[in-house]
């Protein structure tokens, strides 16, 4: 048994249609998350809120989930088909958040 550390979980976060404005106006981020723990979308949202959400959290987070009007695609698939908050992130997953909320 080697004493190798668990490799980080590398994923890509993308933000579109205005969602990036809540995250320092950065549209794409590559993350290396602690590979020793299981990462679900619920855990990812908590991490995002604590670490990279810079503006008006209420426009992105509502309770433990994203607020209505934020679309979440995981590898181009609607997260509703993948279990939403329960989805377990896999290496090289691409998670895209799109805001459908636009001011008038």
From Swiss-Prot:
One of its GO terms (cellular component) is cytosol. CDD domains: Ubl_Urm1. It is found in: Cytoplasm. There is a cross-link at residue 104 (Glycyl lysine isopeptide (Gly-Lys) (interchain with K-? in acceptor proteins)). It holds the Pfam family Urm1. Keywords: Cytoplasm, Isopeptide bond, tRNA processing, Ubl conjugation pathway. GO terms for biological process: negative regulation of JNK cascade; protein urmylation; tRNA thio-modification; tRNA wobble uridine modification. The modification 1-thioglycine is found at residue 104. Pathway: tRNA modification; 5-methoxycarbonylmethyl-2-thiouridine-tRNA biosynthesis. C-terminal thiocarboxylation occurs in 2 steps, it is first acyl-adenylated (-COAMP) via the hesA/moeB/thiF part of the MOCS3 homolog, then thiocarboxylated (-COSH) via the rhodanese domain of the MOCS3 homolog. Belongs to the URM1 family. HAMAP family: Urm1. This is Ubiquitin-related modifier 1 homolog. It comes from Drosophila grimshawi (Hawaiian fruit fly). The gene is Urm1.
